[in-house]
Amino acid sequence: PAEVNKLLQAALDTNADVIIGSRFLNREGFQTSFVRRLGIKYFHWLNRILTHKSIHDTTSGFRLLGIRAIKLAAAYYPDDYPEPESLIFFSRAGLTIKEVPVVMRKRQGGKSSIAGFSTLFYMTKVTLSSILSYVRKI
């Protein structure tokens, strides 16, 4: 609950349309593997090129969406691996995006759908989808 409150407080303080709970701003809590961090840094770089915004945790699904973002997401939210791609169309639509530091814990169960050979597929798919979101009419 404390981490959710950080997102709610940021929304009240900033009136941002999208609030992202970021693992990497304060580097507290679970930080994921080195290889996964490289992938996240790649999507940070790609997002920065396409949107001119520096969002450090582009793969975080811990988000709070305001009404404008919800309306846009209802029409355009990707089915597969939506986190990096959605930031591009939120940015293109002129929505305000804010990151706040949160503490996340390691996965308690289950397995990531992105492991082994599927990592290459994921990176390729999200890169192409992000570029298409950049040129797509919103």
What spans do the regions from the language model cover?
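A C-terminal cap/extension of S-adenosyl-L-methionine-dependent methyltransferases
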Residues: 92, 113, 136
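Catalytic donor-sugar/metal-binding loop of nucleotide-sugar-dependent glycosyltransferases
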Residues: 53-54, 75-78, 87-105
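C-terminal, non-catalytic tails of nucleotide-sugar-dependent glycosyltransferases
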Residues: 125-138
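Acceptor/aglycone-binding surface of glycosyltransferases and processive sugar-polymer synthases
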Residues: 1-80, 107-124, 128
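DNA-recognition element of transcription regulators
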Residues: 84
